[in-house]
Amino acid sequence: MRAMVVIGHPAPASFNHAVAEAVRRTWLEAGCDVAYHDLTAEGFDPLLTADEARGRPSEDALVRAHIAELQSCDLMAVIHPNCWGAPPAIMKGWIDRVFAPGAAYTFAKGDDRGDVPQGLLRARAALVLNTGNTPADREQAVFGDPLDRMWREGILRYCGVHHVRRALYGVVATSTVADRAGWLADAKTLALRVRDLAAQA
């Protein structure tokens, strides 16, 4: 199976990178062909162009390569911190440019004037792993956990990926070595579950 792992964090020594590496290694050991993308290290440009916003194909070679991988993968994982209830800018720009109309989704009548979207992605399972410094109960009670809704309903299911697993790890700032080891173990467990879901779909 083809897998795609995308990490959106500016610091290469971040805990997010440790999580992404745990997922990558788990899928490799499970026999997956894994494409790994550190958006910052690759110099991914998050700025959506005017032509792309109109639904025209991107002229950026890296964007086109990411789109091709997104279209061909059987399962995927995205890892990033919670920044004001949203992904960091580089990850949001990756979504804007790579989950492109005609590549990730379309509409029955060929327009976006309220029609129900048709997901085009081949992947049927995805893993979303976020980190934060807000306790999970407060994140849900006060903020409604916007990242869960965004990824699960607003992006992945919108584009045809119906099996979504997500975890929020925190509070990272006050975490212990044991806390982080537990989160990494959880990430590996979830990665295997998502691989199994993709295999069964």
Outline where the language-model segments fall:
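Glycine-rich phosphate/pyrophosphate-binding loop and the adjoining helix
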Residues: 138-201
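Short catalytic/ligand-binding loop motif for oxyanion handling, primarily in non-cytosolic enzymes
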Residues: 13-14, 45, 85-88, 136-138, ...
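N-terminal beta-loop-helix "entrance" segment that forms/cooperates
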Residues: 39-58, 180
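Residues at the starts of beta-strands that form the adenosine-phosphate
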Residues: 2, 33-35, 124-126, 162-163
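Glycine-rich, highly charged phosphate/nucleotide-binding loops
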Residues: 53-72, 183-194
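Helix-loop-strand module that forms the ligand-binding subsite of alpha/beta enzymes
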Residues: 59-152
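N-terminal beta1-alpha1 ligand-phosphate binding loop
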Residues: 2-32, 37
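A short beta-strand-loop structural module common to alpha/beta enzyme folds
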Residues: 32-43, 167-170
